[in-house]
C-alpha cells in the first residue's frame, strides 16, 4: 500500500515460519529474521532492559500506549512472580517485530492491536486472543489549520502498517467520502519517531495513541484532534488485546493465567492509585512528561475483561479486508476467553473491585 514516503514495509506473513521451531536457536532466528526484515532488540525491564525475577518466564512483546498500562505495571511490579511466573519483555526496534515475534514463536504472548492479531491469525499463526488490553485512546491529530477531513487530501499521514492506527484513518476518510488513495502515507517505525516527526512538521496528520495524542495537542500550538474514535466506533471500543500462542495455552495454562491475573491487579491499581502508577511508569515505560500523562489519564483505560467486545473485534475486520491485509474473516475460534473466565472465577474479590469490565 505504499506510494508511500520512507515506507517501513510490514513483513510478508505468508513467508514466515509460525511453527515456533526458530525459537530454539537465537542465532538461527536472527539470520531468518534479517531475511524477512525483522531484527531482535533487547530484553528485560522497562523499555530498555533490567533485572530478572524468579519464576518460570513468559516472554512478551508490547506496544507503547496506555492500552499497555496493565502489562507494563504487571511487569514493573512482577505481580505474577508470587504465582511462580516471571514476565519478561522482549523489546523490538519497530512495530512490525512486535507482531511477528509472536507469530514466529520468539515470545509466548503479545499485547498488540487486534487488527495485527487478525493478520497473524489469517496467515496461519497458531495464536488466540485470550484477554483485553485497553479501550479507546486512539486519535487523529492534525497540524494547525487542518481542521476537517476535506483538508486532509494530499496531506502526509504518519501511522503504522497493519495497525488500528492505520485502520482508523482509513475509516475516518471513508466516513467522510474520501479515498485512502487521496492522502500520502508515511509508515513509521515506532511511536517516538512518529511523534517527533509530527512536532518537526514532517507529518501533516498522525494517528496515534494516548498519552501521545493528548501530548501533541498540548505541545503543538494549534494542533487539532479530529477524532478520538468514539464517533467512529462507539464508546468503549477495543484497541489492543492480549494474544497468546496456542502452545502456551496448552502447555502452560497456569503461567498464562498468572499473567492475566497480574494484569487484572495492575488494572485495579491504575484505577485506585492513578498518580502513583503514572509516576512509576512515566520515563521507564512512557516517553512523555508526567504532566501530559496526567492530561491523557482516563482516555485509554486498561480493561482486561474484553468479553463484551467480542463482536466488535470480529466485525471490525471488514476494513482490514478492504485494505487487502486478510483474505477472510476470522471465526469465533480466534478468541478464547476460557482462561480469563477461570481467573475471574478464582479471584472474585479482585474482579468485583474493577471499574471497567464486561460483567
Model regions: which residues?
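Short, solvent-exposed loop/beta-turn-alpha elements that line the ligand-binding surface or hinge
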Residues: 78, 82, 230-235, 301-310
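Sec-dependent signal peptide recognition
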Residues: 31-35
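Conserved C-terminal helix/tail region of periplasmic/extracytoplasmic solute-binding proteins
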Residues: 321-359
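Pocket-lining segment of extracytoplasmic ligand-binding domains
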Residues: 115-116, 192-284
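Short, glycine-/small- and polar/acidic-enriched structural segments
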Residues: 54-190, 194-197, 204-210, 225-227, ...
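Sec/Tat signal peptide C-region and signal peptidase I cleavage site
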Residues: 48-54
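N-terminal secretory signal peptides
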Residues: 1-28, 39-43, 51
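Secondary-structure end/capping motifs
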Residues: 250-329
Amino acid at each position: 500500500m505504499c506510494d508511500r514516503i520512507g515506507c517501513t514495509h510490514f513483513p510478508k506473513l505468508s513467508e514466515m515460519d509460525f511453527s515456533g521451531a526458530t525459537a530454539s536457536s537465537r542465532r538461527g532466528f536472527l539470520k531468518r529474521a534479517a531475511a524477512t526484515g525483522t531484527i531482535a532488540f533487547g530484553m528485560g525491564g522497562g523499555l530498555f532492559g533490567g533485572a530478572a525475577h524468579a519464576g518460570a518466564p513468559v516472554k512478551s512483546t508490547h506496544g507503547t500506549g496506555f492500552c499497555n498500562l496493565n502489562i507494563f505495571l504487571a511487569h514493573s511490579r512482577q505481580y505474577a512472580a508470587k504465582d511462580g511466573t516471571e514476565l519478561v519483555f522482549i523489546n523490538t526496534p519497530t512495530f512490525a517485530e512486535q507482531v511477528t515475534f509472536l507469530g514466529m514463536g520468539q515470545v509466548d504472548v503479545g499485547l498488540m492491536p487486534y487488527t495485527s492479531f487478525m493478520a497473524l491469525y489469517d496467515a496461519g499463526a497458531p495464536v488466540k486472543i485470550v484477554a483485553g488490553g485497553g479501550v479507546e485512546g486512539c486519535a487523529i491529530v492534525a497540524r494547525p489549520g487542518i481542521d476537517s477531513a476535506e483538508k486532509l487530501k494530499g496531506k502526509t499521514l504518519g501511522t503504522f502498517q497493519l495497525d488500528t492506527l492505520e485502520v482508523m484513518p482509513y475509516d475516518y476518510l471513508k466516513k467522510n467520502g474520501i479515498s485512502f488513495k487521496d492522502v500520502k502515507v508515511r509508515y513509521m517505525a515506532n511511536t517516538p519517531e512518529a511523534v517527533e516527526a509530527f512536532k518537526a512538521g514532517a507529518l501533516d496528520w498522525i494517528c496515534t495513541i494516548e498519552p501521545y495524542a493528548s501530548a501533541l495537542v498540548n505541545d503543538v500550538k494549534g494542533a487539532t484532534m479530529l477524532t478520538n474514535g468514539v464517533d467512529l466506533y462507539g464508546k468503549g471500543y477495543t484497541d489492543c488485546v492480549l494474544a497468546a500462542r496456542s502452545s502456551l495455552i496448552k502447555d502452560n495454562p497456569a503461567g498464562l493465567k498468572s499473567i492475566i491475573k497480574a494484569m487484572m491487579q495492575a488494572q485495579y491499581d491504575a484505577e485506585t492509585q492513578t498518580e502513583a502508577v503514572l509516576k512509576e511508569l512515566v520515563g521507564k515505560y512512557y516517553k512523555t512528561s508526567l504532566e501530559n500523562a496526567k492530561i491523557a489519564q482516563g482516555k485509554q483505560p486498561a480493561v482486561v475483561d474484553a468479553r463484551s467486545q467480542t463482536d466488535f473485534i470480529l466485525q471490525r475486520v471488514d476494513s482490514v479486508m478492504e485494505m487487502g491485509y486478510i483474505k477472510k474473516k476470522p471465526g469465533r475460534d480466534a478468541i478464547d476467553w476460557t482462561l480469563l473466565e477461570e481467573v475471574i472465577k478464582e479471584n472474585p474479590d479482585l474482579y468485583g473491585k474493577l471499574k471497567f469490565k464486561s460483567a
